[in-house]
Design a protein with these regions (language model features):
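Cleavable N-terminal export/targeting peptides
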Residues: 1-33
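Gram-negative (and chloroplast) outer-membrane scaffold detector with strong preference
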Residues: 61-136, 165, 194-196
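Membrane-embedded beta-strands of outer-membrane beta-barrel proteins
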Residues: 58-62, 97-101, 153-155, 159, ...
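Outer-membrane beta-barrel "beta-signal"
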Residues: 35, 98, 184-196
Length: 196
């Protein structure tokens, strides 16, 4: 009797565990489904180490799924880079708003791993050297802080961890106009998206 009871309990526990561990694709990529995405990024700077110094970025965006697994997004990003000048660094900070569209390029049969490509329009403010014109060696910085605008191309690999949580690895190339520094700014990022 005791053995029979423990077998029933064990069977019920295994059934419950399997029910919650097996994916149910019915709740994935539904039109009008929304999500919130949080990412950390690293700008790719020529001649610099990938994770060098204070070069980093963070972003948060809202996603809205359309038909056929594609989605739109609205996001804000902050990115900081250090540009070497003699023996010290000049900080370049960007605060950007992005509006874009992502289209599925490739996926596995169960829609667990998806490869997306997309485009976005962006605009924001770029601050250079915390608005200080005079550098520590007495030189005057001719570049200035200003509003910037442009577009970006995106590529991402999105992996469903659960039906509502995705792990993301993204690459983007931003084209910024109105800037005095670099017009093309590539970056890589990783993060999570929570669909609801």
């Amino acid at each position: 009797m005791v053995m029979k009871k423990s077998n029933i309990i064990l069977t019920v526990c295994i059934a419950v565990a399997m029910t919650f561990s097996l994916p149910s694709q019915a709740q994935r990529l539904i039109p009008k489904q929304r999500g919130i995405e949080v990412v950390g990024s690293v700008p790719l700077i020529k001649g610099e180490k990938l994770f060098g110094g204070d070069n980093f970025g963070v972003g948060i965006s809202l996603t809205h799924y359309l038909k056929r697994e594609n989605y739109t997004f609205v996001g804000v990003e902050y990115e900081q880079q250090n540009m070497a000048y003699r023996s010290y660094n000049v900080k370049l900070k960007d605060a950007l708003l992005q509006v874009g569209y992502m289209h599925p390029v490739l996926s596995d049969r169960g829609k667990n791993v998806l490869l997306y490509g997309g485009i976005s329009a962006l605009g924001g403010y770029e601050q250079l050297n915390e608005d200080k014109k005079l550098l520590p060696d007495g030189a005057t910085l001719l570049n200035r802080s200003r509003f910037v605008y442009g577009g970006a191309v995106h590529g991402s690999v999105e992996v469903f961890l659960t039906d509502r949580v995705l792990f993301l690895v993204k690459a983007q190339g931003r084209f910024l106009f109105g800037t005095d520094v670099h017009c093309f700014r590539p970056a890589v990022s990783a993060g999570l998206r929570f669909n609801f």
